[in-house]
């Protein structure tokens, strides 16, 4: 298996998209509520501390958001990620007591929304805290709950707005450092210039290039690059949600590869199953380069900017030189 996790419960995972994650048991939820309440009480003083106090405790539900928190907050923030292991399937992540404690202690939380990290809502609602600010990226972008693709960080327009929102939230918690946070957010946004240039260069050279995917992990990025994703959306969504795709869609996907209708196959490097492995093998047999893309930021050695730049670089290498890159 190329992915470090495997999705083999195709039929049983059909409800995962709606629920966001596996349901938390009543007992665990009760314990979480107690843990969060204790943590919230312990940290309430810190959350309302005088400007210029100790480090702000912040949590990103996904490592990419935690990384941006750290870049914007700098020396005044202690940022951590709930989902930071690229060997974990984000779609089957289950919150633990330790996670509940971590979220309960946070003064700032950044989460994705659209059901991708619904366990965060469960934890936060178990014990609300007036000292906790939550940035829900879905709400920030004014996206509906019916938005089909939750991988918002792959849209180049997402993180600049997230960085600015983080700076604003941190400035409320520690107003004396507002200029520092705003300068860091501006520096982060400026640093995305290399990614913007790489996207523009790819689009100028390869706009309309046909590609296939197993899941919609990088679909927002593919759109910005001008690539033409020929894989049926319903196929991508079924694989993402752990549902068996229709025989018709499977046949379409096979034809894209066996008939050389696409220049590259992108797959979710973190999660594969027997079906997706068969498509990877078919692509390789037909000398179509395969590129692995990630749902959570690879660590160590990457920040959000260099991660996205690497994804664009690898896709360009596949299209231009038929170079496969399955691991960053």
List PLM regions with ranges.
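Extreme N-terminal signal-anchor transmembrane helix of membrane signaling/transducer proteins, especially
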Residues: 33-37
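Extracytoplasmic metal-acquisition and chelation regions
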Residues: 2-3, 7-28, 38-328
């Amino acid at each position: 298996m190329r992915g470090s996790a495997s999705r083999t419960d195709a039929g049983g995972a059909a409800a995962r998209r709606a629920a966001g994650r596996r349901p938390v048991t009543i007992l665990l939820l009760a314990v979480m509520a107690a843990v969060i309440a204790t943590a919230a009480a312990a940290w309430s003083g810190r959350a309302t501390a005088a400007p210029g106090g100790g480090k702000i405790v912040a949590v990103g539900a996904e490592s990419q958001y935690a990384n941006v928190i750290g870049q914007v907050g700098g020396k005044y923030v202690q940022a951590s990620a709930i989902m930071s292991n690229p060997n974990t399937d984000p779609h089957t992540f289950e919150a633990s007591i330790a996670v509940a404690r971590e979220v309960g202690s946070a003064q700032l939380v950044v989460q994705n929304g659209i059901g991708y990290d619904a366990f965060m809502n469960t934890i936060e609602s178990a014990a609300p805290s007036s000292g906790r600010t939550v940035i829900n990226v879905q709400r920030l972008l004014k996206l509906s709950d019916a938005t089909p693709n939750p991988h918002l960080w792959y849209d180049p327009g997402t993180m600049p707005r997230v960085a600015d929102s983080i700076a604003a939230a941190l400035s409320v918690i520690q107003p004396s450092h507002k200029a520092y946070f705003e300068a860091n957010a501006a520096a982060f946004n400026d640093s995305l210039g290399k990614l913007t240039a790489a996207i523009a260069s790819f689009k100028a050279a390869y706009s309309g290039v046909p590609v296939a995917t197993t899941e919609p992990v990088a679909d927002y990025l593919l759109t910005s690059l001008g690539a033409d994703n020929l894989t049926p959306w319903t196929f991508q969504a079924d694989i993402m949600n752990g549902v068996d795709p229709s025989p018709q869609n499977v046949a379409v996907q096979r034809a894209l590869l066996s008939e050389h209708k696409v220049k590259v196959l992108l797959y979710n490097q973190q999660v594969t199953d027997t079906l997706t492995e068969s498509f990877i093998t078919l692509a390789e047999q037909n000398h179509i380069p395969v590129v692995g893309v990630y749902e959570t930021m690879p660590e160590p050695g990457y920040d959000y900017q260099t991660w996205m730049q690497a994804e664009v670089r690898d896709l360009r290498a596949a299209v231009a030189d038929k170079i496969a890159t399955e691991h960053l």
